[in-house]
Amino acid sequence: MGKSLLTDEMIERANRGEKISGPPLLDDNEETKILPTSSSRFGYANPKDHGFSQETLKIQVEPSIHKSRRIENTKRNVFNSKLNKILFAVIFLLILLVLAMKLL
C-alpha cells in the first residue's frame, strides 16, 4: 500500500498555520487558491441580495391518499384467498375429470 497523501500530523500542522512542504503530488499548471472561511456569510446566500422574500407561500395542493401497510396487506390477503379458491376449484375439476376418464 502506498504512502498516504494526508496524515493526521499534516492536518494538525495545517491547522496551526505551518507550511507543509513536500514533493508536488500532481504536475499541473493550475494555481491553487486558498479561500478564507472565517467570514460569517461563507457558504450561505443572502436572500435579500437576490430579491427573495422571507414570507412563506401557501400552495394549494389536492389532498393525496396515503395507503398504509395494513391496507395493502389486507388487499393482498383478499386477493390471495380468491386465488386459492380458484386454484382449489381448478384442481378439484381436474381430479373429477381424471376419475371420469378412468370410469369410462
From Swiss-Prot:
UniProt superkingdom: Bacteria
Chief location of this protein within or outside the cell: membrane
Localization per record: Cell membrane
Protein name: Penicillin-binding protein 2a activator MacP
Transmembrane helix keyword on record: yes
Disruption phenotype: Synthetically lethal with PBP1a. Deletion of this gene with concomitant depletion of PBP1a leads to progressive reduction in cell size before ultimate lysis. Cell wall synthesis is also dramatically reduced in these cells. On the other hand, cells lacking this gene are unaffected by the depletion of PBP2a.
Membrane topology: Single-pass type IV membrane protein
Modified how: Phosphorylation by StkP is required for its ability to promote PBP2a function.
GO cellular component, one term: plasma membrane
Record's comment describing the protein's domains: C-terminal transmembrane domain is sufficient for its midcell localization, but not for the full function.
NCBIfam families: accessory_MacP
Oligomeric and partner information: Interacts with class A penicillin-binding proteins PBP1a and PBP2a.
Organism per entry: Streptococcus pneumoniae serotype 2 (strain D39 / NCTC 7466)
GO biological process, one term: peptidoglycan biosynthetic process
Phosphothreonine found at: T32
Role noted for this protein: Required for the in vivo function of penicillin-binding protein 2a (PBP2a), which is involved in the biosynthesis of cross-linked peptidoglycan (PG) of the cell wall.
Transmembrane segments: 83-103
Gene: macP
Cytoplasmic side, ranges: 1-82
InterPro entries to which the protein is assigned, alphabetical: MacP (IPR047752)
Keyword annotations of the record: Cell membrane, Cell shape, Cell wall biogenesis/degradation, Membrane, Peptidoglycan synthesis, Phosphoprotein, Signal-anchor, Transmembrane, Transmembrane helix
Ranges of the Extracellular topological domain: 104
